[in-house]
Amino acid sequence: MEGGTGRCLCGNVRYTFQGVPNWQAHCHCESCRRVTASPFTSYLGVSHGSWRWTGATPATFASSPGVRRHFCPSCGSPMAYEGDRWAHEIHFFAATLDDPAAFRPTAHVNWNEHLPWVRLADGLPVRYTPRRLTGDEDMGPFLNLIREAFAYMDGIVDPPSSVHALTGAALAEAARAGEVWVIDELSAPLACMVLTPKPGRLYIGKLAVAAGHHRKGLARQLLAHAAIRAKALGLPVLEMQSRVELTGNHAAFEAMGFVRAGETAHPGYDRPTSVTFRRPVP
């Protein structure tokens, strides 16, 4: 789709835009569902300066701090979304397009909030919104996720993984002292990571993905969120470590833009036991 026009039900509010949309996707977040009374919504993002209202000016509702939702004051049709998080663009509802068949979604976003009775077979990738743990939740499910994800290391790495000594209380403390982020779906944890700010860098530990959910981009989504957090904290580098024996992990980290930055040894060992990887924050 390159350029287009759209309107509300009664035709009072209209818009036009030029160029290819920045993105096109389906959103499953609760607030978008409620504002449209639909199981999910579909949007296209258009940069400011590339669009304009051509009919009546829509009414605006501030649904939450920093969020403005535009709708027709005559027929009530939802028209568009604007938010401080996306200050450079407006999001038009795809169903308001005069030619909605031209819409070409590329992903489902906020999938962790999707309704359990929504079954879609379009093959599009799903994107989740990571959730930060406060430390007051039951850490059992997240601890089990980490233990199960790291279990394959048993008998491979020397010394044994520190996961064996990890407790729910320690994970809760990590959430309070640092940051623990999870991706879950219908209350079931799918992936998690622990972020620890260090001088000049943000350390990523306990990156884990649940069995049956590999190769779905969950680790990449968490690492992308880690970059967002690093930027917010003023830290220019992401850092991870992997045991020297786990060459598959090394290749995976390098494929995601990390480079080897050094080696370290556990206490009592006269050889390197871990490899440090780093990636600059864009």
Residue ranges and their predicted role:
Residues M1-T129:
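A short Gly-Trp-Pro
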Residues C32, L207-V209, S242:
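Hydrophobic adenine-recognition pocket in adenosine-nucleotide-binding enzymes
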Residues G83, E239-S242, E254, V259-V275:
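Conserved catalytic-core motifs of GNAT/GCN5-like acyltransferases
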Residues E89, T106, G178, P272-T276:
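Short hydrophobic/aromatic beta-strand or adjacent loop that forms the aromatic wall/cage
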Residues D136-G212, L223-H225, R229, L233, ...:
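Acetyl-CoA-dependent GNAT
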Residues H213, G217:
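Glycine-rich phosphate-binding loop
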Residues A230-S242:
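Conserved GNAT acetyl-CoA-binding A-motif
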